[in-house]
Amino acid sequence: MEVHDGLKSPDKAAKSRYDDDRIDQDSEDEAVRLVANPDPSKPRKISERKRADQAAFESWVNDNKIRLSLPSATKSRRSGIRELFSSDETLETRPTRTRPRERVIEGPREYQIELFERAKQKNTIAVLDTGTGKTLIAILLIRHIIELELGARWQGREKRITFFLVDKVALVRQQTDHIRANLDFPVTGLHGDTVRNLWYSKEYFEKLLQEQEVVVCTAEILYRCLHRSYLNISQVSLVVFDEAHHAKKNHVYARIIKDFYLMEEDCQKRPRIFGMTASPIDTKDTCISYERATHELESLLHSEIATISDRDLLKVIGSRPQEVRKSYARVLRQENTELCNQLRELVGNHPLFKQTFDSAEFAVTELGAWCADKLWELCFREEAVSTLDGRVEGSRARDPDEVGESSHEVSNAREALSLVQQWSFSPPEDGSLSTKTHKLIEILAECFSQASAGNAIQCIVFVKRRDTAVLLNALCEQAEIRTKIPDLKGAFLIGAGRGGNAAFTTTRQQEQTVSRFRDGEINCLFATSIAEEGLDIPGCNVVIRFDLHGTTIQYIQSRGRARMRNSWFIHMTEFGNPEHNRRWFQDRVNEQKMRDFCLSLPKDRIMEKAEVDDVLRGDQSQKIFVVPGSKASLTFKQSLVVLAEFVATLPARPDEILSVDYTVVPVFGGFQGEVYLPASSPLRSAMGGVYRSKQLAKCAAAYAMCIQLYNSNYLDDHLKSTLAKVLPAMRNARLAVSSKKRKSYNMRTKPVLWSEVGPLTELYAMVLSLAQPGAAYYHSRPILLLTRKPLPEIAQFPLFFGKGSSRRSNVRCIPLAHPWSPTTTQVEGICAFTLCIFRDIFSKDFQASGTDMPYFLAPSTGIEHGTDLSSLVNPERIIDWATVHRTTTTDRVPYNFNEPDEFFQDKYVSDPFDGSRKFFMRKVRRDLKPQDKVPEGVPAPSKWRAVEHTILNYSVSLWKKSRAGHNSRQDQPVVEAELAPLRRNLLDETDGENSTGPQTCYLVLETLLISQIPVDTVVMAYTFPAIIYRLENSLISLEACQNLGLDIPIDIALIAMTKDSDNSDDHDEAPINFQSGMGQNYERLEFLGDCFLKMATSIALYTLVEGDEFEYHVERMLDICNKNLLNWALESNLQEHIRSKSFNRRTWYPPGLKLLKGKKTEVDDEHALGDKSIADVCEALIGAAYLTAQAQSSPNFDLAVKAVTVMTHSKTHTMQAWSDYYASYQCPEWLSTPPSQTQLELCSQIKNKMGYRFKNPRLLRCAFMHPSYPRQYENIPSYQRLEFLGDSLLDMVCVDYLFKKHPDKDPQWLTEHKMAMVSNQFFGCVAVGLGFHRHLIHMQPALGGSITEWAELVTKKREEARQLAVRRGQREEDYARDFWIEVHHPPKCLPDILEAYVGALFVDTGYDYSAVVGFFDRHIKPYFADMSIYDMYSSKHPVTHITSIITTQFGCSSFRLMVHEIPDDVQGEGLVTGAVKVVAACMIHGEVRCHAVAASGRYAKLAVAKQAVAIYEDMSPTEFRLRHGCNCKPEDGDGDHGVLVDHRADCEPEEPLRKQDPPAKSVVDVDGKTIAEMRLRHSKQMNDQEECLSW
């Protein structure tokens, strides 16, 4: 464990606690220290890594503190991504692994939508560059067509399906996977190999038609289906032609259209056509007319070409690669090599080798002699011997007349094989390579030298011939070349099938090669034209044309492979070759001609982005006004902003929403706009000039109004309003406190009750007994705790005596109702008994009289652990006075060495020389002698290393010198005994699990003392330290509540005041400095109290304060902010009563006693608390008050309301009881107006639907009044105030339900599942289910469509869930209630009106909370009867999501989300005021990858997690490892990592204006363990190093 903020880790804390101890023979504590010290564990490198990350993060914060403190430091999601990439200029050039297919359908670009919309209306050919998303448009269109077809089938029409046609078999699987990942419909892929045996099976294709929606196949498949009439063209709804430029002449694309498409006379039955290509023509003819070629393509496909402008294209692809030409010396014709000549003599006339000889003759000139010889080596591979024989034999079999000649050819072929195998191939040298090949090696060496510098290179070398690709790859594998280019990892990619004897491959091999290229295993492909189009090859940063392209489209497509930033497109041309020079320039000319032609298409066929900026930029008539004094400028576009800001400063009624209204009407010459300002504006309207577009007309009107306002002095020289609206004064106040900012405070260690000493007149008894007495190993009887004042009864709590449930027992602390007036003798007697217990059992010898004791212990008699004492009047009757008398008269039992056997049974023995040795005698062992060896298994003492291991020496604990002078009796009897346990913290379950139980030993009693206390009393007295610790903590907690005037039961008070770790409030982190055995902490109560505090202050604000929703939020922030709670807690000294330390074996004794012998007791009266922890305790006390009030015979909220008033000291919350809320409510004026008929009708409809009739219909109408609806129509404000109220009410009722239904769940679980219950998705679902959306009143044109769409969607999901239940054999009403999770977020108004309705219901019923509970029970609770179905809902939260991605998906163990406080303004007032911001960063392998700045740690972590999710969600593990150099192994993840947070910043301010779903905190550990498991594991680690039972 590492050290945070100067706090010692548990290991070090334990060490420091013991290091300064001195050996004390009279102390039992020393033995614990000696025997419980664990073996050193292995060094924990993870903790070292954490500390290194912490240091790196703090250094980064310091280096960037000024920039982070600026207002603009809070980055947007995009800027966070840019920042991440800016740290490594080559990040985007890393190879990209094949990942689960991206759902690109979710975020199309604007031009894609426009092309899609066009394709929906008519047949279209989309002309777009490689990598610009043509397939996405096709998928959008496919989905649209399928949806249309589904609708048509519903009407009884014949089923039709979609065909996606590709030109290459290799593209079938690729496009099938891509489409299947982006469509929720059945998709299959077919090519010749899959249906070769099915051509005569019509049934196969009939089944295909019924089961599939999309078929991806080679065009030949569809053609043959249509040809054989397995399908007809009318059964096809859409045909997508990939690489549509192939549709010419007799290509199968063209034949499908000519032979089948045109044969269907009914145009309505013809399928829609969509073509995709990078260029509409594919020809080498440079003289061809683009108009004619494109016209032919359009005519053939019966489609229109559509494209996008160059400007939008550049926005998509960024910048094109930098094109360069590398020239090589002229290649001269070379003679065949010696190997080739010898082989020609042997097999030169055989037709099987003709193609290889042709390739070798080409290679010797084009590539060089080495490559020509290498070709023969590749042809005559060892594994090809059998194939060669078979092919020669096959040739001979086909011509029986040439048997002799064939035999001779076979012999020659074998001789040729032997020649090649024995040939000595020279290494590739400059002389054996052509100038062209040599130039390629130079280029590759130059490019891959960047890889050595840390820049990843992905390269494709395009060639024309298959054998060229194979030979170049073989060349680069040679040691001589690898020395020059060590980072190159090559492979060839060629078309499937055979190309001579060397260049062949399979489709499977193609896929593997491309996959390895994505993975980064290969970084250089030598490829033929197969890599130019279609195949999903990741973008590269180097593309080399070894052989120049033959057509313009090849040029465009191969260039399109270089899509990365700072890419290079290299053309290799022969020096002085006019043909190469012509093609070098002609391709650019041809491309530009194609672009010019496409841009010359009609305007409706060029998709351009219609933005305001474009409209303004294209119109030079717009005006710019420059303010003379400040030089501020006012443009058309900015005038819209200036006007909106001005209106925001106008005075308004609390419920009034001010806005700017525009009217644009067509006039002669264009459009003219007019602007209208609210009635409170000094100027009401202005009219602009006539412009060519509506947008310009609107801007002109705003511009004219701004000029009028400036001229009338309503705008200053900086174009700011002079009518300053007074915003809420504390809107930007720093209200949060840090959970990591810790201070040392005084801590109450003893209750005030113990301070009362002196003469006493009466005593009150509390019986301490066990519910399961058998758990304690030994028989026991209750003991009595006698106090000067009556003690309250506390709830039972568990003690853990050992391992397993059988060793667990609850303690019952039963106060007796009647006091007892003891005599002086009796007081001194029980005082002596108490001191005897301290001396004999706990090795502490105190000097005290009865007047010094705050409490006494007394043995019991005549009662057992389960005895009913309710009728007992006088406690004196159950005290064992005989035992008291014995302890008063003598401190030990006399021993004469000749006692009978019965004497040695059931007595308690202590060692006066070693306080750690206590024993329970069991029986005498006459068969053993003191000189006998100690039997095996006896626990070894600490002081007999240098003595003989006899029973006598075992019994004597003197040091060596003292032992030598001691003469022991050799005839004394040996006693069998059991070693008494030294464990004191019986409250700690983990410590109990480590207990070994009773241990047998053998003693002689000469040097030991036999106690007067009976064994059964001793056993119960052993439990007293744990009991008194819990009792004292309870009393101190109760005192805190009494000081605040809150009558909270003692048990609940203790829970509310208990903080058991330094980061109790951080549920997503492993506990730090965990204090075991303290019982329940305040977390659950704080969760409950926080929610009630929000509800209570919301009701008070709605009741008393007239203001808008923003002002409500500000006021509520002031009331419930942690800073406010902290201040009042400190004023009340609440921090002194917080219980933050676990049981300490040295501090539980009564205060004020004089210690005569034994280790000195410690006084630990200080503790360090975080500011937020103190504020959390305040909320926990509110939660405790709430539970107390709800537990009354008549459940109410009065005590909780009083607690809110006490804790907040707010001027807006002075209520002492629930009834005070409604008593303070005054009906607003707008509710006093008689309702209209429309409002009454709404009231009736809601009555029929909901069962409740509103007393005030106008209040109900208000719940459905959208802010866009003008108030002057009905003089009813919008629902925003009611929504503010209803939001808090629904939060409270949901939290109350979860809290009571799941008493064993921690706040982390409660928060995560509350997210589901109060999410906008769910509330929107309920609103639609109740039909509330039909009652919404608004004036937003787009809102209606959004509501309708979402309502239909959620209704459909509900119906599907019902049908699924029926299909599963369930009742329809038992459908799965989590169907709404899959629905996207609704329009915001839908959850708003649900909350507003609940708020209105609450107000209309006179603040009757039971009405809210009734609404919850009927309409919300049924969805959450089984909460387990929402267990994964929280995984959508960014912090949880990114943690899962990095640690689980990527397996990285060096990931941190860290936060740090910084001054709000390091150069200004922030240094003076102490105002802070919080910066959160995502650190991976010690570097900050992205960051965010916010007002609190909670929101900063949320923001940076969103950035990280955006970056890493679609990244593959391989790309992650390459990008960050991650080499983490599974064993690295030992649970000591995950979401680590700097322990200095975690502020929690009030929620933003619109509530968001409460951010869940991450619970994912990289080991898959929950935080609860981590806490338990941490607890065990701590207890391993604290006191334990045995030596």
Curated annotation (Swiss-Prot):
Annotated ranges, domain PAZ: 888-1012
Residues bound to ATP: 128-135
Motif (DEAH box): 242-245
Marked site (Important for activity) residue numbers: 1388
Annotated ranges, domain DRBM: 1440-1514
Binding site for Mg(2+): 1283, 1392, 1395
Keyword presence, Lyase: no
Keywords, alphabetical: Antiviral defense, Antiviral protein, ATP-binding, Helicase, Hydrolase, Magnesium, Manganese, Metal-binding, Nucleotide-binding, Repeat, RNA-binding, Zinc
Record-annotated Dicer dsRNA-binding fold domain positions: 639-729
GO biological process, one term: defense response to virus
Entry GO terms, CC: cytoplasm; nucleus
Domain Helicase ATP-binding as annotated: residue spans: 115-298
Residues in Helicase C-terminal domain copies: 439-607
Domain of life: Eukaryota
Cofactor(s) required, per the database record: Mg(2+); Mn(2+)
Pfam families: Dicer_dimer, DSRM_2, Helicase_C, ResIII, Ribonuclease_3
EC class (word): hydrolase
Stretches assigned to the RNase III domain: 1050-1190, 1243-1406
Record PROSITE patterns: DICER_DSRBF, HELICASE_ATP_BIND_1, HELICASE_CTER, PAZ, RNASE_3_1, RNASE_3_2
The name this protein goes by in its record: Dicer-like protein 1
Function: Dicer-like endonuclease which seems not to be involved in cleaving double-stranded RNA in the RNA interference (RNAi) pathway, contrary to its DCL2 counterpart.
